[in-house]
Amino acid sequence: MPAETLTEKVVYDRPRSLSERPNHYCPGCGHGTIHKLLAQAIDELGIQERTILVAPVGCSVLAYHYLKVDGCEAAHGRAPAVATGIKRVHPDRVVVSYQGDGDLLAIGMAETIHAANRGEKITVIFVNNAIYGMTGGQMAPTTLQAQKTKTSPYGRNPAEAGFPIRACELLATLDAPVFIERCAVNSVKAVLKTRRAIRKGLQNQVERKGYSFIEILSMCPTGWGIEPREAAAWIGEAMVPVFPLGNLRDR
């Protein structure tokens, strides 16, 4: 009786666009997951050789270590301006601006608004963890009301610091953006939806459409002072009511 022939079927493998280098992010941080999702989308679309990543100041400033694509660092808040310049000079490239909440909505608010209003053909991935992570846990534009941080030890007081800024809703008031969606990475279901949104944002560039914006609610256990599992739950309990998930525009 002939021996049975065994076959192997690969059901999961590391994305080609994702480096094998161990990342520097804290345990429970969502950046590593988001990097993987971005790499998967790049591979699926076959655009690794065409992709340029712009990473400004923040926890993600070393993102170029983990994604096997061309990369460029930008000054704090200036990633959309740098991405705009690259895209206009190289319109055939897929340009991704990867930013955090302090970078995108504080020092970089002007660049964010005007790049979106011009309809620049770039893809912005906005990681919202409601805090300044890299610099030690200070209050960010997205910090929730009453949330305690290093610079709001008694909780964010709207009378003094204003309310959390909802980036997706703000950009949805503009006419030019073609895709705006808010996702999360705190559960398997949420991660799958985020993967689809990132792929759509990149696909829009491949099809030479306009500005795409993907906001991702992400965990920062170190900055929040809680355990990773608690951080994932906190997104659903505290952040989602303030930053509702869903698509605001797709055209």
Please provide the spans of the model-predicted regions.
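Thiamine diphosphate
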Residues: 1-133, 196-200
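Short, hinge-like loop/turn segments at secondary-structure boundaries
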Residues: 69-72, 115, 140-144, 230-233
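Active-site-proximal loop->helix
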Residues: 109-114, 134-148
